[in-house]
Amino acid sequence: MNHSYVIVIPSTIYNVPAPLTIVDGLRVAVKSALAKAFGGYTETMATGGYKAESGELIEERVYLVEAAYEVEDDELVESLALQVKQELHQESVMVYYKDLRARFI
């Protein structure tokens, strides 16, 4: 496997904690889709932050869901990111396209 996708799932809507049912539902949807398409995923909880229009630094819990792949499917990954963006009313959702060297032993 030479590449991986990472979709960053935020946990807020307009600086307010999002309902867990929405966040957890999106996490399950993304993980299920990546597992089906690429055989598996890794999820990591982290802290993300951004500067609000007011100038305030906003920090929130985020979930990074990563899947390694040999055959790309940008359309799937971008549609998942769009779903996250829409359901959590985000201006944008970050997707990493990473080169890596990995194998199963």
Residue ranges and their predicted role:
Residues 1-105:
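Positively charged, small/polar-rich N-terminal and surface patches that mediate targeting and assembly
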